[in-house]
Amino acid sequence: MAEAAFHPPRRKRRVFECYQAPFPVGPGAGDFRMCRADMVNNCVVVRSPEDMDQLYNKGYFGKGILSRSRPVYSISDPSLVSKWQGANLNVPIITSKKYQQRVQWAKSALQEQGFDGCSVTKILENYTRPLEFPFLEKGGAEQTGDSCDTVCPNTENTELSGQSSTDTGNIATSSPECQKEVCQKAYAEGDPASDSMVGSKEQEPADVKETAQTSCQMHGSCMHCGCKAKGAPDRESCNMAKSRERAPEYVLVQEEEESSLCPEEGSAREQENFVKKEKLVCRRNPFRIFEYLQLSLEEAFFLVYALGCLTVYYGEEPLTILKLWEIFSEVKPSFKTTYMAYHYFRSKGWVPKVGLKYGTDLLLYRKGPPFYHASYSVIAELVDDNFEGSLRRPLSWMSLSGLNRTTVNASKELLLCYLIKPSDMTEEEMATPECLKRIKVQELIVTRWVSSRERSEQDDL
């Protein structure tokens, strides 16, 4: 057997963040934080923004359900955010067309719940009416009347011109309070029928000022998440997370209105004097989509068993380590094998991620996906002392060659991880995670043998 040649990990050219910590646990007792996750539809999800930030930034555990990796989903239109960036806004900005689309989604959701057309129309009219605009940053708290209106004459030969306006009517309108019965009916944004992650208990939305004045550094200045300050008890954090899910989300809708620059009537160029004036109107989002941090079963069990910084709940009942081992093994028959490999490589300092994209069990990153490309694609197999047993993935020479080619073309190396269990290990021992103490690991790196290269090396010798 030839000796393996190890290649250093390839660092990414553009890195936009700093490395914080390998694990979400600190050296001191004051830095420790117990996070919470929920078992939903055989998946483990984290709902609290603070827990999501803790688990992803320190160890890169999980991924956002609406994002490629980091949970940074926002409904804001990027072009509108850059256009209105001088207004110091901290709530999402969307177009009128996108808002009407969400109104239609909310209408369909309410009709599916049994409401008639008249009731649905009345509910949505009350729920989506314009509100007062209290969501400015601290730097612009005294400038509630400022706006960045774009004035566009309704003619083809006129250029766009931007001008500043101090008219408070451009953004602010009436400020009615959220009526209890309307909010309870118009719960398309937090209703279990439209969001399976939200619980079944109804709760009155929180006050506008209490939820809107909190800004989260993780989500940026253009996204309202309502994250609470650090240092609060876990129970209070859970209650605030639930109330935040049921509280309304406020958005700024860019709308157009026509106005006349020349008040004289009977003018020959009256049509040219009408302009389209863009303004931001604050409204409730009738159909809210939540993003959560989804953990793989291996990541969730590692956080519970190895680090002890996560508690997984099923409903309101916390699950024990033995119960999680049993449930995860039923949900995923190969869980024991893949977790053994995950635990081994995590302990070695690698950041394992799901390798489904390349047809393997795991991908190994140094530090994390934002800093380095994946170095290895791992296939894990559980065998006995004689390297015998029922393999999860019997590989023929053709399939092994194809898998290796796929891995090499992505600038990675194929690694076979054999988890060797003693011959005297019983099924009772395998039923608990204590079996990890008796497992041995052997790694094999697969390389393609090239005959011409071998001949040239022999000739050189």
From Swiss-Prot:
Residues 140-176, 190-210 are annotated as: Disordered. The keyword Cytoplasm does not apply. It is found in: Nucleus. InterPro entries: tRNA_endonuc-like_dom_sf, tRNA_intron_Endo_cat-like_sf, tRNA_intron_Endonuc_cat-like, tRNA_intron_Endonuc_N, tRNA_splic, tRNA_splic_SEN2. This is tRNA-splicing endonuclease subunit Sen2. GO terms for biological process: mRNA processing; tRNA processing; tRNA-type intron splice site recognition and cleavage. One of its GO terms (cellular component) is cytoplasm. One of its GO terms (molecular function) is lyase activity. Residues 144-176 have a biased composition (Polar residues). Constitutes one of the two catalytic subunit of the tRNA-splicing endonuclease complex, a complex responsible for identification and cleavage of the splice sites in pre-tRNA. It cleaves pre-tRNA at the 5'- and 3'-splice sites to release the intron. The products are an intron and two tRNA half-molecules bearing 2',3'-cyclic phosphate and 5'-OH termini. There are no conserved sequences at the splice sites, but the intron is invariably located at the same site in the gene, placing the splice sites an invariant distance from the constant structural features of the tRNA body. Its EC number is 4.6.1.16. It holds the Pfam family tRNA_int_endo.
